């Protein structure tokens, strides 16, 4: 292995037996017909399970709703993108010319997908207990900081409560674009809010994720503006 990849494996805290799994996890679909989306699918499920299991044992008296909200906070795209930046993943991603030109190595969705793909790759290279230890090590500070309660509500819920508390109409979400094939789509959603000059746009791999992204941006604009 060359030294840049060795640096990445040190950051990840895991030495791969099969280097090709790591290479595949870092390969975006824009770069090659063999890419990281199957690994991402696997890693997404493993991450959700590992975090759910940890929350269940860490918070024995917390109800299902709060645990679901805490898990959503920990596994959402921007949290994964933060992890990706901490690892310096953008320097190692294999992207096609178009994505490189448009700064894909900085994009939250691409970084988040790569983190999930790496989780899938670690699992295939080892086993569930090893990948559990790796993931929990990555999440140490976030697991220590997270608490049950209102702050874990998803963005759509928080936006709705924000508007209701000010006696304003509820937001209207409209899908304005869907691109890609059925198994690999990107949804674009506009969130219209009374009193805002223009709709807020969110994107995601499902309608729900796009709506949540739009709601998060709308909340930022409303609270910071």
Swiss-Prot record:
GO molecular function, one term: rRNA binding
Transmembrane segment boundaries: none
Enzyme Commission code: 3.1.26.3
UniProt entry keywords in alphabetical sequence: Cytoplasm, Endonuclease, Hydrolase, Magnesium, Metal-binding, mRNA processing, Nuclease, RNA-binding, rRNA processing, rRNA-binding, tRNA processing
Natural source organism: Vibrio vulnificus (strain CMCP6)
Annotated S-S bridges: none
Pfam families in the cross-refs: dsrm (PF00035), Ribonucleas_3_3 (PF14622)
Protein name from the UniProt record: Ribonuclease 3
